[in-house]
Amino acid sequence: FSSFFPGIAGLKGIPMWAFYVNRGQGICSFGIKNKNYSIMEFYPANVSYSVVNTFGFRTFLKIKKSNKTICYEPFLNNSADTENIKQTMKILPYELILEEINKNIGIKITVKYFTLPNQPVAGLMRSVTVENITNSDISVEVADGIPKILPYYMNTYAQKFMSTTIQAWATVDNFEKTGVPF
């Protein structure tokens, strides 16, 4: 299934839309106003089902336990071990929660999405929690994010039919001064 997450922003906030599917880490596109103001490229549901694991949010874990290193990407849905790996998705009016419990590795991963209410900017907030569910010590390194953020007002036409030209014109402002692109 697929749907739009409510863009709840409060009385003084700016609403943000987010499109999710029941695969991967859920969110496959989000932005403000409409799809011409996407932050993450909009795809219809039939395409989103197959690209969310590549173009959506991803989490990579490097887990060290008992002198053994395991590299793992949760929420991939490529395991036939449904007895030891459980995934759930909770959809609330103000929050989307994904949870994976992997008994083989001994971890529980929780991802929460929610909008930023009553603020002068729109925001899709994301929280990732990794919990050790064993009695053994583990060390975890995490890399998390999305593979591509669209420049402001890169409309749907430009995304679909002029992407190479638009990429050549995209710039990053203020990086030299602050070290933070915006």
Task: Give short role names for the model-derived ranges.
Residues F1-F182:
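Anionic coordination/interaction segments
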